[in-house]
Structures are given as C-alpha cells and as structure tokens.
Amino acid sequence: MTHPIVKSFYDTATGSWQYVFHDPETREGAIVDPVLDYDPNAGATATRRADEILAYVAGEGLTIKWILDTHPHADHFSAGPYLKEQLGAPTAIGEKVVEVQKLWKGIYNLDDGFRIDGGQWGRLFADGETFMIGGIEVAVLFTPGHTLASIAYVAGDAAFVHDTLMMPDSGTSRADFPGGDAAILHASIERILALPDDTRVFVGHDYAPDGREPLCESTVRQQRESNIHIRDGFARSDYVALRDARDATLPLPDLMLAALQINIRGGRLPEPEANGQRYLKIPLNQFEGDFSE
C-alpha cells in the first residue's frame, strides 16, 4: 500500500486544520477542508490561508485532483471555490449535504433560487464510494452525528475525520447543531475506530488545551486507548449522557450563522445586490442566546 504524504495547515483564528495529501510517486493530491479567511468585525474575506496551500502545492509540484469538504462547516468559510478557480480541480462533498441544505434553507428563509440538490459541488459522494489519487485508493465513510452530512475520507493509511474525533485529550466533537445527534455520532466514531490500529487519524479542529501546541494527528489505537470520551468500554448510553451534558454548556460557534449560509452554497458568497454589494443574512432569535456575565 502506498502511504500518502500529508501536509497540515492550521488556522489559528478558528482552530481549524486543513490538509493536502498526495501520492509520492505520481505527485497527484487532494485538498481537504480549506479555509477562507473572514473578519466578522469588518465583514471582510481574504485568501491568506488558501494561498499558503497554493504555495505548497506549487512548491511540491503537485497536481490537485480534488478539493474535498467533509461537511458544511459552522466555524469557518470554505475556500473551495477559490481553490477550484486557481487549480481547476473539482469540489466534492457527501451526498447527504442536500439534507443540510433543506434544513438551513428554511432557517435562512432562502428563496427558490437557492438549489437544494448539492449542485454547488462538482461531485456528491455516497457512503462506501471510492476514488483514486494517483495509486492511492480513497474510501468515503458516512459519519453523521455532528451534522447530517458528515463524511470521512480514508486515503491509504490516513483518515481525515474532521468533526467526529478530536485529539485524545480533547475527546469528540459536539452533536447539538440542527441535525446533530450524539447517539449517531457515537456510531460513526465506532466505525472510524474499526479501521486498522495504525491508521493515522487527522482531525478537523484542535483548541490546544492547557497551553500545549496545536496537534492534528493520532492513530486509531491511540484514540481507542486514551480518548477521554470514547476509550474502550465506554457504552453508547454513557457517551450520549456525557456529550449532551457537555454540549449544553457550549456557546454556538462565533461564525456559525455567517459560515453556514456560505458553506451550504459550496463556499460561494451570496450574489451581489442591486448596488453591487454582497450581504449576509442573520436570523434573529432563531437560537437561544448566551447572556451570562
């Protein structure tokens, strides 16, 4: 088996990990969960993080075959369309994204011009589908629970699991977003932990607890033995109770209401209005606020 070379890129503003993996023999590669910079105070976007990826791709002489999303993110904007424009590679996500689009179309009260067929991406992957990056087979695993549409990409010995597992000292991702479900997330995590012990696990977020450096990589064995939420022997009912209690204490992500209306469009910004300006739309009082001191 050819093992992919994996390069990680950390976005400090959102605690998000982005990845480029490639076949060292053919130099073909893919990008996973790229971030578009966004300053909420100024309402401004930038491509600094994506440009770092482009510089790496050019420096390594890679041919990017796919720009991959694991799900529509609630904490950052996707840079997929920008990278597609620069590289010519198609974008892809899991086929259940249509369920997320239907859900959030109602929350944002979007008009019928908003497509809910996933057509904003070049490809919608089904569970169990495979594709090739050079000589490396990439398998798609449906891993819902954090969202309705979450998938993981298993490329050789590397699994890109995004918002399911976190680093072992941080546990697992939340399951309280619209369409989330802790019991379903637990089942998805079990599916990931059924991969071979030495499978490299690359997470989507790390918030550097206790002041350590941000980390992105562990193994299935390490997750099974030491993850604080799901180590061996932790029953699903116990996990659901723990996850639900933990989620009840968490504020919504700072960028959720801004990011999701971009990301259900495949990362495309809203169309300009008559004055040539683009606008975000925020539903007031749709969610419970945090007014604690």
Residues of each region from the PLM?
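Accessory terminal helices/loops
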Residues: 2-4, 187-200, 204-293
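Conserved beta-strand hairpin/beta-sheet module of binuclear metal-dependent hydrolase folds
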Residues: 2-63, 152-162
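Core dinuclear metal-dependent hydrolase active-site scaffold
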Residues: 6-9, 20, 127-155
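Active-site environment of divalent metal-dependent phosphoester hydrolases
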Residues: 14, 38-39, 72-77, 98-101, ...
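Divalent metal-coordination and catalytic microenvironments
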Residues: 21, 33, 71, 83, ...
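Active-site neighborhood of phospho(di)ester-bond hydrolases with catalytic His/Asp-centered motifs
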Residues: 32, 63-72, 92-95, 143-145, ...
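Active-site HxH/HxHxD metal-binding segment of metal-dependent hydrolases
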Residues: 36-136, 226
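Active-site-adjacent loop/tail segments of enzyme domains
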Residues: 172-195
